């Protein structure tokens, strides 16, 4: 992201004069990141008290060898992430999703997305989900405008899911929530037999998932290694 900390602080001062629901994103695992950087980020949170905070772990993609050498180790990244988690809890934030915390209330938009409910996506690259139909719009502005002028949907991807695929997507997203999935609620939408099949697949011989009454959720270890844990749904 091209902005500096100074840029962010300047924009924040302007925004907080006009808006009350603001979110601040942090990324853990960046090149050259160390304990001092984490301390400064924590200090910013404590000073600004944003209503909502997101802390994401950097996804390693096609980094060249020079950049890869400057990345913190996996153990260091986990240590930094846990430090963020502890600092946010100490500061009065409530964690409601793997990477998201709030002071007074969670993001309703985020909850609708993670609970896999209906939402309409409008504009470039926007995604929507209605019933079992999921789509993503094209990212090219000229193509987007042309499709609309022709009376066509500007979708780059569009698919009506099967029951099994819709269930897998629902589990994949709602398991990111600290509360996990309400299995009884899922049974109103999906086959109970199909649900139990996936629950057994996730829970058996796994340190990552636990079933508590009618809820299925990630364990503390599963939250820390969510990418690996949720691969069982792929």
What are these regions (language model features)?
Residues 111-115, 123-206, 210:
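Hydrophobic, secondary-structure "cap" segments at the distal end of domains
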Residues 221-234:
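Short, amphipathic alpha-helical interaction segments positioned at domain boundaries
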Residues 28-35, 50-73, 95-111, 125-135, ...:
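Flexible glycine/acidic-rich beta-alpha junction loops that bind and position SAM and/or redox cofactors
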Residues 25, 45, 53, 96, ...:
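Conserved, mostly hydrophobic/aromatic
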Residues 103-104, 116, 213-216:
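Self-splicing inteins and homing endonuclease
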Residues 88-94, 209:
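Short glycine-aromatic motifs
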Residues 1-89:
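Conserved non-cysteine loop/helix-boundary elements of the Radical SAM core domain that shape
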